[in-house]
Amino acid sequence: MYGSARTISNPEGSPSRSPRLPRSPRLGHRRTSSGGGGGTGKTLSMENIQSLNAAYATSGPMYLSDHEGVASTTYPKGTMTLGRATNRAVYGGRVTAMGSSPNIASAGLSHTDVLSYTDQHGGLGGSSHHHHHQVPSMLRQVRDSTMLDLQAQLKELQRENDLLRKELDIKDSKLGSSMNSIKTFWSPELKKERVLRKEEAARMSVLKEQMRVSHEENQHLQLTIQALQDELRTQRDLNHLLQQESGNRGAEHFTIELTEENFRRLQAEHDRQAKELFLLRKTLEEMELRIETQKQTLNARDESIKKLLEMLQSKGLPSKSLEDDNERTRRMAEAESQVSHLEVILDQKEKENIHLREELHRRSQLQPEPAKTKALQTVIEMKDTKIASLERNIRDLEDEIQMLKANGVLNTEDREEEIKQIEVYKSHSKFMKTKNDQLKQELSKKESELLALQTKLETLSNQNSDCKQHIEVLKESLTAKEQRAAILQTEVDALRLRLEEKESFLNKKTKQLQDLTEEKGTLAGEIRDMKDMLEVKERKINVLQKKIENLQEQLRDKDKQLTNLKDRVKSLQTDSSNTDTALATLEEALSEKERIIERLKEQRERDDRERLEEIESFRKENKDLKEKVNALQAELTEKESSLIDLKEHASSLASAGLKRDSKLKSLEIAIEQKKEECNKLEAQLKKAHNIEDDSRMNPEFADRLKQLDKEASYYRDECGKAQAEVDRLLEILKEVENEKNDKDKKIAELESLTLRHMKDQNKKVANLKHNQQLEKKKNAQLLEEVRRREFSMVDNSQHLQIEELMNALEKTRQELDATKARLASTQQSLAEKEAHLANLRMERRKQLEEILEMKQEALLAAISEKDANIALLELSASKKKKTQEEVMALKREKDRLVHQLKQQTQNRMKLMADNYDDDHHHYHHHHHHHHHRSPGRSQHSNHRPSPDQDDEEGIWA
């Protein structure tokens, strides 16, 4: 009845047919009746209707590329399922299923959907949000009232239909009884009416064909209604899923893109549904034409029945066969008139049903609700069942007429029995007249009911005017939506500008982080230099301690010698005769001492030569080391291009900071120990001064002491030169070590080959240091031996050496204080820079988290959009290659987006884990080292997203 749809060419000329709608079985019949006119006559063909339904069903989510490809027959963004279109609001807006089913159409977004859209995205102001919550409640009240009215009307119509069915059953029983009486009273005189019966049989065959076609069309419409119901269910499921997704993301800020394309899409949808309305009206007119043809066939049947009734009524005596035939035909005509009257009533009811369908159709355009669509479907099914029952009754009547005609051919021998039956029939005719009167009364009742229905139609027209006003309100809301779309577009542009500013700010922060890491590296190098200086000072302090110990031993030897000399002086005073022998022994001792001094000079010259040779060898080794360092520098310059990420460097800095703090603690403890040792040495020096004062009281050895002082000064000069040379070599070594440390910072991230080279270099430098320390120890031992031998004869030189040692100790203390001050300043600067670094890292983390969140939201929106498109393409149940290729392409895009989403979530989880580790490490270090500088943390915040994440410009576009 309303599901026969046929194809018409697209605006571009490519015919497309809805894949879900089965083809009408009345195609050939309708073509013959319409004369092949697709849209020229009063009614459009079903192909035109179906093609227009398919042509206007392609309004999906519009993109920039859709404007270029509208003329094509492939639909990558929308679907083509029986006049339906899927409109998705961007970022989790409510999905509305709009369709053009037979006599059920929806125009664009419904008012409730528009308001729900504004409810979801209307969080820009409190008053606007409150207003958006008030409007849907009013509309719900209006909708509920209209639904209640429609339900009441439907109940009344159902009651009327039940009454009509009962009346038809009663009339069918009456007609059956009359037909039985006609069969019993039939006579063979009606052989004359065979020609009429043949015509009637031809008409009946035509009517049967029409009834069969109408029955097939009813089945076809039931199939279409079931398909539409399935699509409605799937669309509701999709709406439910998308509403859940939008509800899950309701707490987050949305990026609404209600642009001009969306507004154009809504206008196109509105125009499409207006055209669908026009087509549905055409289908209704076509159905009215079909009803008129059925009326004509029923009128023809009524005429034949009237003739039969007149013939029956005209039957009287057997001698008056013609009069009897006329009477029978008259009675048959009366029965047919009753049937025609009932059919007229049926036609009126069908017209009323059509008007009600139009009204419901208009209401469904304004407010397409699933409850209304269900109610309309139930009404349609009821009407279909009513039509089917009427058609069955008509078939029964036709069968009875044929049986009457067949039974009309009787033999002349049975005429007497028929005369008796005619008398019985006359009695029955009286009964039929009374029944006719009752039917007339019932007709008057039906007329009163028709008046009531007219009043209902007037109320429905009033409601239609209200709906028009509602449409005007919707137009005003559309204009408001356009303004809001422009505002949202400006906000989107502003957000994009903010994103660009944040990216530039992130780049600046990364540059600042790199500069700070470089400054931190330089400060770490300075701290290492300080540590090296502290080590040198410790070595000097150790040498001085050894010298002091040697001097103490020499003082003890001198004390013993003094006691011996005193004993000798006493022996000389007691025994003057032994003076000559004592002088001889003294001269021999002096000669022995001179020989010993000469031997010591020769040994010192040999040691000097050996020392010079070793110094030259050390210089050669230093040159070789410098050449190797230059080669390593060349390799480093070649490999500096591969130094991209600073994580390992930051972790090495953190470990170095921890080691540095531990070394500083150990150095502070060592300095305190050295202070205590210096105090002890000062006390010992005081004792030595007292002993020297006692030794100066002896004037006999003054000349000898002067000579020994000269020799000691000469030896001191030589030792000073050697010490200066050693210091120069140590400075060279420090420079080499500083260069090595600077290079170690860069070499830490290079390959294992450079690491092995640097390990070998470190070993060589350590060996060189060890050799130099051994050389220093040898020189110190030689000097100590020389000084011991000198101090065995010279007491005055001890005082000078002790003064030199005190001066050296004071210098080392001053240098230690200076290094402590420098260390404190560097620690403060490092703490400040590390705090600045921590702030920069926190800002960078926050910005990275915001960017990752925005990218995840964009990916989720894109994935949900792809899922919706895939589901709608799969629901279309089309086996065309184009749709399958579109589904496969959408699935590939969805897989790619899901892969990107997984990468984003992994990066975000990694960033969160790094933040947790950094915070935990910072808290632990701050808890255990509250009075010290916190070490540099690993630079996990420098983690950048993978290049795959930056390939998502399509999402941000």
Curated annotation (Swiss-Prot):
Residues 14-25 have a biased composition (Low complexity). Residues 140-917 form a coiled coil. GO terms for molecular function: PDZ domain binding; protein-containing complex binding; structural constituent of presynaptic active zone. The modification Phosphoserine is found at residues 65, 666. GO terms for biological process: maintenance of presynaptic active zone structure; regulation of calcium-dependent activation of synaptic vesicle fusion; regulation of presynaptic cytosolic calcium ion concentration; synapse assembly; synapse organization; synaptic vesicle priming. Its main location: cytoplasm. Residues 1-13 have a biased composition (Polar residues). Residues 948-957 have a biased composition (Acidic residues). Residues 922-943 have a biased composition (Basic residues). GO terms for cellular component: cytoskeleton; endoplasmic reticulum; GABA-ergic synapse; glutamatergic synapse; Golgi-associated vesicle; growth cone; neuronal cell body; presynaptic active zone. Residues 1-44, 918-957 are annotated as: Disordered. It is found in: Cytoplasm; Synapse; Presynaptic active zone; Cytoplasm, Cytoskeleton. Signal peptide: none annotated. Keywords: Cell projection, Coiled coil, Cytoplasm, Cytoskeleton, Phosphoprotein, Synapse. Predominantly expressed in brain, including hippocampus, cortex, cerebellum, amygdala and olfactory bulb. Residues 760-957 are annotated as: Involved in binding to RIMS1. SUPFAM superfamilies: Tropomyosin (SSF57997). Interacts with BSN, ERC1, PPFIA1, PPFIA2, PPFIA3 and PPFIA4. Interacts through its C-terminus with the PDZ domain of RIMS1. Part of a complex consisting of ERC2, RIMS1 and UNC13A. Thought to be involved in the organization of the cytomatrix at the nerve terminals active zone (CAZ) which regulates neurotransmitter release. Seems to act together with BSN. May recruit liprin-alpha proteins to the CAZ. This is ERC protein 2. It comes from Rattus norvegicus (Rat). The lineage of its organism: Eukaryota, Metazoa, Chordata, Craniata, Vertebrata.
